[in-house]
Amino acid sequence: MKIALDPYMFRRVPLTDLPALVADLGYSWIELSPRDDFMPFFLHPRADRAQVAAFSRALNAAGVRVASVLPLYRWSGPDSGERQAAVRYWKRAIQITADLGVDTMNSEFNGRPEAAAACEAQFWRSMEELLPVFEREGIRLVLEPHPDDFIEDGRAAVDLIRGIDKDWVSFLYCAPHTFHQGGDIEGIMKYAGPLLTQLHIADSFDHRASSGLRYIVNPPGSAARIHQHLDIGQGEVDWDVFFRTLTEVNFDGIATVCVFAWEERARESSAHNLEQIRHYLAKHGGTA
């Protein structure tokens, strides 16, 4: 298992200083999430060859590697122009990933729940254009359902991924989205089976609990989706079930700490979660 850090809470750290910081926190792997100076959210990548080369040198010097690159683009529309732009952005992001020597990219479906059928059609159109590019560059694609996306349910996401029918396209289970994707950690992981190749690890409260009043959102009846990315142990994800099931399905992929809630103590948070992962792996017979 590759235990990686999503360094989003450290996004203001210069890119070439990031690998040394990650190593100092005890991690050997990075999941490279969007940064304004490299691959921004929903915009064309900013990185040039010189920046990619400098980042590669910094990674080598720190003894840290990139496990996966995470871009977020509107490749499922529903706006056709946004979809076409997203495909262009994806092609550049794939090239940068290949230049970094990274073999995995992960992302979301990035559509809208109120236009699910139209967004799925746009998603398949993007797949027709991009699957050959992924395949040519030898890069794996890992997809996750997300709150407020056209696919939010874990099993439905597994079904769609299975329909892509490529052995290098697989499923990411995001722990802080547990209560939006069905609330069944064990069932979804086992349903995914060998398609489960990547994890996002953070805690969250169950928004459905206490008669739906764990959170109070105004105005009443709002369709807003609420979740957190907290430290392990601060929410209601059942971590014993989570790690026990990983052992049962022989998971040996990428496990990324993606806590966003504590920028004011980001170093302590990152170290704590690495320690907690090791604790639960030891408890349930897993390996890192």
Q: Where in this protein do the model-derived segments appear?
A:
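Active-site acidic/histidine proton-transfer and metal-coordination neighborhood
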Residues: 16-17, 57-65, 75-173, 268, ...
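Catalytic domains of carbohydrate-active enzymes, especially glycoside hydrolases
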Residues: 18-36
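Short, acidic/polar
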Residues: 12-22, 85-95, 181-189, 239
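Glycine-rich, proline-tolerant flexible connector loops at the mouths of alpha/beta enzymes
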Residues: 33-56, 110-115
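Conserved, mostly hydrophobic/aromatic
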Residues: 5, 22, 30, 59, ...
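Conserved beta-strand positions in the central sheet of alpha/beta enzyme cores
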Residues: 31, 68-70, 106, 142, ...
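Acidic/histidine-rich catalytic cores of soluble enzymes
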Residues: 2, 29, 125-236, 285-288
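Active-site beta-loop-alpha junctions enriched in small/polar residues
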Residues: 6-10, 33-35, 71-74, 110-112, ...
